[in-house]
Amino acid sequence: HDELDDTSSKIRRIRRIERLGADVLTISADVADMNQMEAAKTRIDQEFGQIHGVIHAAGIAGGGMIQVKTAEAAERVLAPKVKGTLNLGRLLDDVTLDFFVLCSSVSAVRGVTGQVDYCAANSFLDAYSFLKNSTTDTLTVSINWDTWQEVGMAVKAVKGLDKRIIK
């Protein structure tokens, strides 16, 4: 892969984590698909035993004005955060977790023009965190991240916009 390739960057980051002493198991699964998540959990259980914590960072930025957005397009944006969180909750209901971190966005609080689905998905994470903290002993935190400078959806969106402008 090219040095600037997204896959190469991810591989370098994983190798750096491994050099620091972590055991890493990479699994490709759609967090919104319960069957895929059950298969992933089975592999994790076989490799490591019990899960002690979760960092849920899946998401799709989406975009487009609500007046012209289709239900299918909104569902694609909502699914990783809403269905994904619910799937993780169901899948790990019988597991005592030390922590459950949800990577939300400041857009849940501020809103972003043209991203009603993304804002709603992140608001769901915040509400889910509140619910879990009031009904379980698992520390559940929803972090309202702002734009990251070097990684994440915002960087990819800007790169995509740059490519369209250059053409």
Please place each PLM-identified region on the residue numbering.
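4′-phosphopantetheine-dependent carrier domains
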Residues: H1-K167
